[in-house]
Amino acid sequence: MLDEVLAELDPKPGEVVCDCTLGGAGHSIALAQRIAPDGLSIGIDQDDMALKAATERFSREAPRAEFLPLKGNFGDLDQLLVGARVPGVDCFLFDLGVSSPQLDIPERGFSYNEDAPLDMRMDSGKDTPTAQEVINTYNEADLTRILRVYGDEKYAARIARAIVETRGKAPIETTFQLVDVIKRAIPAAARRHGGHPARKTFQALRIEVNHELD
């Protein structure tokens, strides 16, 4: 994947590159090494931990490159670049998904393989609805919509109905509680194929919570 990115973007010394989904900074480091020493590598992420880790990684692995970390959502790309007084960018990189460090911290609630509170906020310090709030407050139609649109979930309506029925008895508060609801909603035959049955639902919730496609 990295080789394909480098071949497609073909960064050159002195250029300005912007990684709009910084995450673990692996792609940014590789790009920065190509544009050093006079280029500028910009990294955007909502997660304070990701920005801090990337800054430290740049100092170790790309010390000759100039790195500008910007906290925010790539949906606000124009405002972020104007606010940082960046005159122009030669190439942009978007890698939609969750970085490994985020998955490695169970309490962030991104992983369906670890039991944790349903949070999923990339910026955990931001006062925005968590996945738990989405699951327990959205009506059935809205839940169906986000599962279908953001997760391409074939059984979106069945899962949404099961969520509403379950939360009517008690709130759904943890990742494993939600996984259990999803497994019960999906036909047994479907659970045996296509990866983890909760994968698409968790993806859809993450996108909704963080407004990734706004």
Can you say where each PLM-predicted feature lies in the sequence?
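S-adenosyl-L-methionine-dependent methyltransferase catalytic core, i.e., the SAM/SAH-binding region
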Residues: M1-D214
